[in-house]
Amino acid sequence: MYYPFVRKALFQLDPERAHELTFQQLRRITGTPLEALVRQKVQEKPVQCMGLTFKNPLGLAAGLDKNGECIDALGAMGFGSIEVGTVTPRPQAGNDKPRLFRLVEAEGLINRMGFNNHGVDHLIENVKKAHFDGVLGINIGKNKDTPVEQGKDDYLICMEKVYAYAGYIAVNISSPNTPGLRTLQYGEALDDLLSAIKNKQNELQEIHHKYVPVAVKIAPDLSVEELIQVADSLVRHNIDGVIATNTTLDRSLVNGMKHCDEMGGLSGRPVQLKSTEIIRALSAELKGRLPIIGVGGIDSVIAAREKMAAGATLVQIYSGFIFKGPQLIKEIVNHI
C-alpha cells in the first residue's frame, strides 16, 4: 500500500540512482530480522519445472540483483524463484552512464547497462550467505572484451564456478547491449555453444553428483524462421528450458515518447505482446519437449495468465515490479 509514495520519491531520481538507493536499504536488511519489513505471505502453489519444484510459478527476472546482494530480502517478498546476474567471469563496469531510462507513460524501461557486475567469484560469495528457500537461478554471460568467437569459454568458466550453488543456470545470449552477443543465437554459433554447454553440464554432474538444469534466454526480435531454428537446436542439444524473452530493440509502440530513441533494450509493458507471441510460437514448435519461462511486460495477474495460456510453465517479472512494487508479487502468486 505504501509503494505508490515510495515510487513517487524514487521516480524523482535518476533511475540508476534510485536502484542504488533501494538496494542500499535492501542490503541492510537482507539476512537480518528486519526482513520482516518487506515480508509478504503468499499462497503455496508448487510447480514442477526442469526437474525442480518451484514453490510458486513467479520468479524475479535477471538484471535486478546482478551481484546476488539482496537474495533473502527479495525472497521474503514472495518470489518462488530469483534469477541473479547476469554475471561474467571478470568484473566489468558496463557501459557509460546514463544507461537506464524510464518511459513512464508506457510503463517501460530502456537499458544499455552492458552486464555491469562484480564478477562471478563475488556473486558466489553472496550466494553462499543467502538462505532463500526458493529456487535460485544464476544468469551467466560473457565479458565485453572477450571476442564473440571465444565467447563460449566465458560461459564455461561461469558454469564451472556457479554449478555447485545454482538451482538452475540461465545462459544469456540475447542482451542487445554486449556487441555481437545476439549472433550466438544463430546457426552454427548456437550449435557450437549449446554442444559445449551440454558437455560441460555432463562433466559437472559427474563431479558434483547433482544435475543442475540449463535454460537459454532468447530475444523477442527473432523471426518465425529463426525461432524455429532456435527451438530445433535447443531440443537437439537436450537443453532443459528456454527463457522467453529478453528486451526488444523495437520502438514501434513507444514512438514519440520521452527517451524512446535511447539506445538499448526496451522492457516493460511495450514488450508484453511481442514476448507473448514469441512464447506462443515457441510453444507450438516445442510441443512440450522443454518448458518455457515467460518474461516480458508482466504487470498484472492477467498479463501473467496470458503468458501461461501462451505456453509458459513459469513467469518472471522485472519492470512491472519497478512500476507496481511488491504488491504485484502477492497479486500474481495468489491469483494466477
Curated annotation (Swiss-Prot):
Zinc-finger listed as a keyword: no
One BP term from GO: 'de novo' UMP biosynthetic process
Entry annotation: catalytic residues: S175
Topology of this chain in the membrane: Peripheral membrane protein
Subcellular location: Cell membrane
Keyword Flavoprotein appears in the UniProt entry: yes
Sequence positions that bind FMN: A62, G63, L64, D65, K66, T86, N139, N172, K217, T245, G268, G297, Y318, S319
CDD domains the UniProt entry points to: DHOD_2_like
Keywords: Cell membrane, Flavoprotein, FMN, Membrane, Oxidoreductase, Pyrimidine biosynthesis
UniProt cofactor(s): FMN
Binding site for substrate: K66, N111, R112, M113, G114, F115, N172, N177, N246, T247
E.C. no: 1.3.5.2
Function noted in UniProt: Catalyzes the conversion of dihydroorotate to orotate with quinone as electron acceptor.
UniProt name for this protein: Dihydroorotate dehydrogenase (quinone)
Species of provenance: Enterobacter sp. (strain 638)
